[in-house]
A protein has these predicted regions:
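Active-site-adjacent helix/loop patches that line small-molecule binding or acyl-intermediate pockets
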Residues: 25-35, 99-100, 109-212
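Extracytoplasmic
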Residues: 43-45, 65-67, 71-76, 92, ...
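Active-site SXXK
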Residues: 70-97, 136, 191
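Glycine-rich, acidic and aromatic/proline-enriched surface loops and short helix-turn segments
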Residues: 40-56, 90, 154, 160-167, ...
Length: 220
């Protein structure tokens, strides 16, 4: 539960950050009072970072944790979408992947094999249908983005992880799980930097790909 909550926060960072404009001198404000939001959810450990580029203020709860690398989990759909569009795996955000008719169960982001005990696993009904990229992005459909990663392939994915300098840049042996199983790690601070570059179309992707992804993010 902790990790899920942490990455919901990072997703919030992403959504907020894209509305920013360029900044020069950054003021840092720490907000211990934001602990109540975590306590309300029964979370004993978490962090929050809100960067207001217009006012040039970085607002933190648990600043130390915001600098700690962790699995990007669902937030990796931003990068995954950019690579898919840039490599023509997806021509646009309307690219549909057909549902194979088999509900997928996950535990801590890892797919449970067919026939295995699913008591502690979860299944999201919104994932169990044909989805376009924009629809999959909105509901954070893990099966869709796992298939996208398989189609991209390890070599191409690694090339873009390196060019963007995304976290520790590690894929490991599983092209469809590395952002879920702690192989790839990135800090919330790094995520904010990534979102600033995306907002200004400064990532090593075409302007078209970056604008399509920003448009999908506005659905969140």
């Amino acid at each position: 539960m902790r990790n899920i909550f942490n990455f919901l926060i990072v997703a919030t960072i992403a959504a907020i950050s894209i509305f920013s404009t360029s900044c020069r001198n950054i003021r840092i404000d720490e907000h211990s009072e934001w602990a109540s939001a975590f306590e309300h959810e029964g979370i004993t450990e978490g962090c929050f970072e809100y960067y207001d580029n217009n006012k040039e203020i970085a607002n933190y709860y648990n600043k130390e944790m915001c600098a700690t690398p962790m699995s990007p989990a669902s937030t990796f759909k931003i990068f995954n979408s950019l690579v898919a569009l840039e490599s023509n795996v997806a021509l646009d955000e309307q690219m549909v992947i057909k549902y194979d008719g088999k509900p997928k169960y996950y535990n801590k982001g890892i797919l449970i094999p067919e026939g295995a005990d699913t008591t502690a696993a979860f299944n999201i009904p919104e994932w169990n249908k044909d989805l376009s990229m924009s629809e999959a992005f909105k509901v954070s459909a893990v099966p869709y983005y796992q298939e996208i990663a398989r189609r991209i392939g390890k070599e191409t994915m690694q090339k873009y992880l390196d060019s963007v300098q995304y976290g520790n840049r590690r894929i490991g042996t599983e092209i469809d799980h590395f952002w879920l199983n702690d192989t790839l790690k990135i800090s919330p601070d790094e995520q904010v930097g990534l979102m600033k570059r995306l907002y200004h179309d400064q990532l090593p992707f075409s302007t078209r790909a970056q604008r399509i992804v920003k448009g999908m993010m506005l659905q969140e």
